[in-house]
A protein has these predicted regions:
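Glycine-rich, phosphate-binding/catalytic loops in enzymes
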Residues: 93
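N-terminal, polar/charged subdomain of small-to-medium soluble alpha/beta proteins
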Residues: 1-88, 97, 103-150
Length: 150
């Protein structure tokens, strides 16, 4: 499971020209799911994201987590995070989980991270054509792969 985590002052998801979800200060998390991802990946990644100290404290040092700042969370599924560009110029998405597997893991991830955060994560719509808008704060963008826990 790959997560692209972006600290934002605001973010939103629009589907069919209607805003589905909108947050203020917090994190926008793009999630890519692989076929071999499981509950262990979900639990580890959720805890990591919720407790990542990437918000500034009173001394302007990144020392506070999403929980510490009572921030909001927007989670969007993005299978293209598993693109392979090794051959040719057209990306291959063979490493991404099939939709029937990915949707279950995505929904479980949203449930777990909402519980860990102790507030409901907002979402996009799995498989939909979405317009994602964000105002990156910093900018702070971090990529985490649950298969590479170094």
């Amino acid at each position: 499971m790959i997560a692209v985590i972006q600290r934002v002052t605001s973010a939103s998801v629009t589907i069919d020209q209607k805003i589905k979800s909108k947050i203020g200060r917090g994190l926008l998390v793009l999630i890519g799911i692989q076929p071999d991802d499981d509950k262990n990946d979900i639990d580890w990644l959720s805890r990591k994201i919720v407790n990542l100290r990437i918000f500034n404290d009173e001394e302007n040092v990144m020392n506070k987590s999403l929980k510490d700042v009572d921030g909001e969370l927007l989670v969007v599924s993005q299978f293209t995070l598993h693109a392979s560009t090794k051959k040719g110029n057209r990306p291959s998405y063979i490493a991404a989980a099939k939709p029937e597997i990915a949707i279950l893991l995505y929904e479980e991830f949203v449930t777990v991270i909402s519980s860990d955060l102790e507030k409901q994560a907002l979402t996009g719509e799995f498989g939909a054509d979405m317009k994602v808008e964000l105002l990156n704060d910093g900018p702070v963008t971090i990529i985490i792969d649950s298969k590479n826990k170094k």
